[in-house]
Amino acid sequence: MAFYLSAPQSCPYLPDQDELLILSDPQQVLGSASYDALLQKGFRRNGGLAYRPACPRCDACVSVRIPVERFRLDRGQRRVWQRNQDLQVAVRAPHWDAAHAALFGRYQRLRHPGGGMDEESLRLYQEMILETGGVDAKLLVFSLAAEVVAVALVDIVPAGVSAVYTFYAPEMSARGLGVYAILWQMAWTRSLGLPHLYLGYWVPGSAKMDYKRRYRPLEGFVAGRWRVLPETTGAR
């Protein structure tokens, strides 16, 4: 598989840093087998492309995963788990759904004030959901009665389940839906007999990514191998 370097752009996580990515060839279909190998080397998927940071002045991004058999809930996570036992979860193939898109728009307005579901964000949403690169992707749809309150896009490969993106009802923040989605994915990964839940990149110093270190044990891909990260925030 061929790879290319992206053009540099501002880092979305750390100020005063530029982001440079290694990207897979968009003319080649990823497929589950190829992506499984790439995921284990620190790559992630966005639409039909696999990518990995290759920033010239920074190596803060650490690909992380949870060994699901060894994970134990802490007190706060246990409360979130119990609080959301009234939710139903359906596993679906990726598809367009207007209610999901509307929920995504509400979530984006919370995460990016002043934004919303404009034409560009709608296009990005469609690409994220529908362009899977030949990878076995699923939508996890969390509902309260008949109302969809959270949606998680995940990939399934032999190495485990990879959490691609999760969005949820911002007005239900007291439920901890983002945390519950991760906890549910861990239980589901275990039920599938798979070893790891991949959470993407953890970036020390980024408030957006700090939540990932609360799941223990947490393994990071550092210096070409996976290892358990220390309880403190520094990965190196």
Which residues are covered by each model-predicted region?
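A conserved beta-strand-loop-helix scaffold within acyl/acetyltransferase catalytic domains
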Residues: L49-P56, I66-A174, R214
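Conserved acetyl-CoA-binding loop-helix of GNAT-fold acetyltransferases
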Residues: A174-A187
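Nucleic-acid nuclease catalytic cores
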Residues: V161, Y165, A169-R175, L192-L197, ...
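A structural signal for short, well-ordered beta-strand segments and their strand-loop junctions
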Residues: N46, V141, H196-G200
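Active-site catalytic microenvironments for nucleophilic, acid-base chemistry
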Residues: L110, W184-L192
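Conserved donor-binding loop and adjoining core beta-sheet/short helix segment
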Residues: M1-R44, G48-R70, L144, A152-S162, ...
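Active-site/acyl-donor-binding loops of N-acyltransferases
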Residues: R52, V62-E69, H196-R236
